[in-house]
Amino acid sequence: MAGADENNHGERLVRIELDDATGARRSAEAEQERAIAIYDILEENKFGLPNHAGPFHLYLRLEGRHVHFDIRNADDIEIAQFFMAIGPLRRVIRDYFHVCDTYYDAIRTKSPSQIQAIDMGRRALHNEGSELLQARLDGKVITDFKTARR
């Protein structure tokens, strides 16, 4: 889907591909946010694998109740694969999407202070999800909080 300057070597992602085999339809807003998130990750990230030098390509695919991580080197040669169960993240994901829906509705009808309160809740859930993700990736992937948050 997206790539960054391949000359930026180091412990970082330079390409991210999301497999949309589920065929799920997303709103234009959701697609825009997804594209921005990928762009932001590629612009600034910390991503490494124990015993492997970067840069890396990351292919993510949802398979049942797991996310399949396919990690490759800059030549697109596979160097690691693993599955991560979604279960531990399910509540945070569900709550986050609910708060986002509430936020988009609030933009049209609520006061700035009410919108700010909803946004603070969204950010707190985002942070919680980031911490959970980092814990789930511990030992498999080396990353920082900012990258996990994106």
Predicted regions and their residues:
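Generic signature of intrinsically disordered, low-complexity, basic-rich segments
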Residues: 31, 49-50, 73, 81, ...
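C-terminal charged interaction modules
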Residues: 114-150
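Long, charge-dense
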Residues: 3-25, 92-112, 116-123, 132
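Charge-rich, low-complexity N-terminal segments
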Residues: 1-57
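A surface-exposed, charged beta-strand/loop segment in the N-terminal or early-internal portion
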Residues: 54-101
